Amino acid sequence: DGHHARITDARRLTHLHEVHRANEGDRLTVGIQGGAMGKATLTELNKTQALFALEDINEPPPPALPVHLVLALPRPRMLARTLEHVTALGVKDITLLHTKRVEKSYWQSPELRPEKIHQHLILGLEQARDTQLPNVTLCKGFRPFMEEQLPALLTERRGLVAHPGMENACPRGIDEPTLLLVGPEGGFIPWEVEQLLAAGCEGMHLGPRILRVETAVTALLSRLF
């Protein structure tokens, strides 16, 4: 009704009981999905529900990063963790892309069902105390992406391709709209890198270490922004 809220799902109830160790009468920070944040008083808490009396819910969520992340589809378990991490860091636009070294079987994973993706995004938002869900797009072909999506994505963004062996190091502290492209575990193949550079992207590297995708993405976002 705009003044009260109810939680009934087991995961969040367990979090209130075991992590917050909340008690009736506690004031907690809350957020409305897609909306603002603020404070609420916990008026009832039991095994089946939590009731809140909402106060002024008018605080904006944390600012988003000015980045559209294009990520070669990782293996399913890593996809789940990566979605949570990048959502917590403030990424609001994500494209999952097929490349030569992405196993085709990954596209059949239950982790790509809309409800599973939504679940991982929610976990990332909760971790960061954010309310704005990212947009996730699936692109199952590299050539169609290059021809139909990349030109528009680059019109108002600086394109950066993260790939070992590139000449330039990853820039630091940039504050401009950016398109960040990250390859799969084995990296982009040379032809893919050539196509991306020819389209106007800049190549860059994170140093001599070869990192797992989830580690590399976190490091890139932290360094860039």
Please give the residue ranges for each predicted region:
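Structured adenosyl-cofactor binding patch, chiefly the S-adenosyl-L-methionine
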Residues: 190-225
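Active-site/ligand-binding-proximal alpha/beta "capping" segment
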Residues: 152-193, 202-204
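RNA substrate-binding interface of SAM-dependent RNA methyltransferases
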Residues: 60-158
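A generic structural signal for short beta-strands and their flanking turns/coil linkers
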Residues: 3, 24-26, 36-38, 48-50, ...
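Glycine/charged-rich beta-loop-alpha catalytic/anionic-binding loops adjacent to active sites
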Residues: 6-10, 64-68, 176-179, 198-206
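N-terminal positively charged helical leader segments and presequences
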Residues: 1-59
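Hydrophobic side chains in well-ordered alpha-helices
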Residues: 16, 79-82, 192
